[in-house]
């Protein structure tokens, strides 16, 4: 998205020359855009969620579990992100956005435990986390945050059929304490299905930008364009940082022109941690309203 010099100048001055900073959509510097979510939206899946990020981004995720070959670590999570035909991107055959989003989601999933997904010496659950971007006003919008939040909610609602194996009486989902047998039974009763484990390690991604002396959360395209740098930062429910990636270097229009300092980098991490934990805490309320429509998330 090409912005004019007057647009860049106005955005930069509004943020850096006023106290408090004036953002073009009226938010405070540490405020996310309005967002809402819904869970259990896709019949036939093991878990699902849908998230709207402002009026510009909407993502739906379905989680499907299948029995597959065990890995040395146990089972595995497999991410996939597609862009709906209704979303305009330059060239669907060569565009890097789907692969970038898939890679980012896979990085978050790789933090989750998979050892317990193995239930025989050679078989384990393979968890497919499939996302579709069904609305994006621009490929440069904040898709990462919506994607990670939708994945978090979908995994929270996911249930796996209970597995029984010979000579094992205490089964959660799978078990690393089994007799060396390839026999197993899958319980088809949904009410006996069990939740995923270790989801406290799943992260939500918060975007933060440094614009001269100001740090802003969830930057717009205009704000990212005048920032020295924009980071995507993964935050777990505990506030721990699990993921960092530079996703924009706007060139610092009319800025100091200097690279950010270590101290500023730490400030960016701390800001993301605070906002991310609030978002995860607020989003947990949605889980009580399965299938009842969209609910606002107010971190």
Swiss-Prot record:
Molecular function terms from GO? 3'-5'-RNA exonuclease activity; mRNA 3'-UTR AU-rich region binding
Q: Which Pfam families match?
A: RNase_PH
**Which SUPFAM superfamilies does the entry mention?**
Ribonuclease PH domain 2-like, Ribosomal protein S5 domain 2-like
Q: Is Iron-sulfur given among the entry's keywords?
A: no
Coiled coil, from the record: none
Domain of life from the UniProt record:
Eukaryota
Enumerate the Gene Ontology biological process terms: exonucleolytic trimming to generate mature 3'-end of 5.8S rRNA from tricistronic rRNA transcript (SSU-rRNA, 5.8S rRNA, LSU-rRNA); nonfunctional rRNA decay; nuclear mRNA surveillance; nuclear polyadenylation-dependent mRNA catabolic process; nuclear polyadenylation-dependent rRNA catabolic process; nuclear-transcribed mRNA catabolic process, 3'-5' exonucleolytic nonsense-mediated decay; nuclear-transcribed mRNA catabolic process, non-stop decay; rRNA catabolic process
Primary location recorded for the protein, binned into one broad class: cytoplasm
- Give any Gene Ontology cellular component: cytoplasmic exosome (RNase complex)
Provide this UniProt record's keywords sorted from A to Z: Cytoplasm, Exosome, Nucleus, RNA-binding, rRNA processing
InterPro entries on file? ExoRNase_PH_dom1, ExoRNase_PH_dom2_sf, Exosome_comp_Rrp42_subfam, PNPase/RNase_PH_dom_sf, Ribosomal_Su5_D2-typ_SF
Instruction: Name where it's found.
Output: Cytoplasm; Nucleus, Nucleolus
- What is the recorded function of this protein according to its Swiss-Prot or TrEMBL entry? Non-catalytic component of the RNA exosome complex which has 3'->5' exoribonuclease activity and participates in a multitude of cellular RNA processing and degradation events. In the nucleus, the RNA exosome complex is involved in proper maturation of stable RNA species such as rRNA, snRNA and snoRNA, in the elimination of RNA processing by-products and non-coding 'pervasive' transcripts, such as antisense RNA species and cryptic unstable transcripts (CUTs), and of mRNAs with processing defects, thereby limiting or excluding their export to the cytoplasm.
Q: Which PANTHER family match?
A: EXOSOME COMPLEX COMPONENT RRP42 (PTHR11097:SF8), EXOSOME COMPLEX EXONUCLEASE RIBOSOMAL RNA PROCESSING PROTEIN (PTHR11097)
> Its quaternary structure?
Component of the RNA exosome complex. Specifically part of the catalytically inactive RNA exosome core complex (Exo-9) which may associate with the catalytic subunits rrp6 and dis3 in cytoplasmic- and nuclear-specific RNA exosome complex forms. Exo-9 is formed by a hexameric base ring of RNase PH domain-containing subunits and a cap ring consisting of csl4, rrp4 and rrp40.
Family in the record = Belongs to the RNase PH family.
Listed name of the protein: Exosome complex component rrp42
Q: Which organism is it from?
A: Schizosaccharomyces pombe (strain 972 / ATCC 24843)
What is the primary gene name for this protein? rrp42
């Amino acid at each position: 998205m090409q912005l004019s010099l007057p647009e860049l100048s106005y955005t930069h001055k509004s943020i850096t020359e006023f106290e408090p900073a004036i953002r073009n959509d009226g938010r405070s510097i540490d405020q996310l855009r309005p967002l809402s979510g819904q869970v259990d939206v896709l019949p036939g899946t093991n878990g699902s969620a849908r998230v709207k990020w402002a009026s510009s981004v909407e993502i739906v995720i379905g989680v499907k579990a299948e029995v597959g070959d065990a890995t040395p670590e146990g089972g595995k999570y497999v991410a996939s992100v597609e862009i709906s035909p209704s979303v305009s991107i330059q060239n669907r055959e060569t565009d890097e956005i789907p692969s970038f989003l898939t890679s980012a989601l896979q990085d978050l999933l790789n933090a989750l435990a998979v050892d317990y997904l193995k239930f025989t010496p050679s078989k384990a659950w393979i968890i497919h986390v499939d996302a579709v971007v069904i609305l994006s006003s621009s490929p440069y919008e904040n898709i990462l945050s919506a994607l990670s939040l939708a994945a978090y909610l979908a995994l929270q609602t996911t249930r796996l059929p209970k597995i029984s194996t010979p000579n094992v009486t205490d089964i959660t989902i799978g078990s690393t304490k089994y007799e060396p047998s390839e026999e197993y039974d899958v319980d088809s009763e949904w009410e006996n299905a069990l939740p995923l484990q270790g989801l406290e390690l799943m992260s939500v991604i918060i975007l933060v930008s440094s614009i001269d002396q100001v740090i802003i959360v969830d930057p717009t395209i205009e704000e990212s364009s005048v920032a020295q740098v924009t980071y995507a930062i993964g935050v777990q429910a505990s506030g721990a940082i699990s993921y960092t990636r530079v996703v924009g270097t706007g060139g610092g229009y009319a800025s100091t022109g200097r690279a950010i300092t270590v101290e500023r980098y730490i400030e960016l991490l701390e800001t993301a941690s605070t906002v991310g934990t609030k978002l995860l805490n607020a989003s947990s309320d949605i889980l009580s309203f399965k299938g009842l429509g969209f609910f606002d998330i107010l971190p």
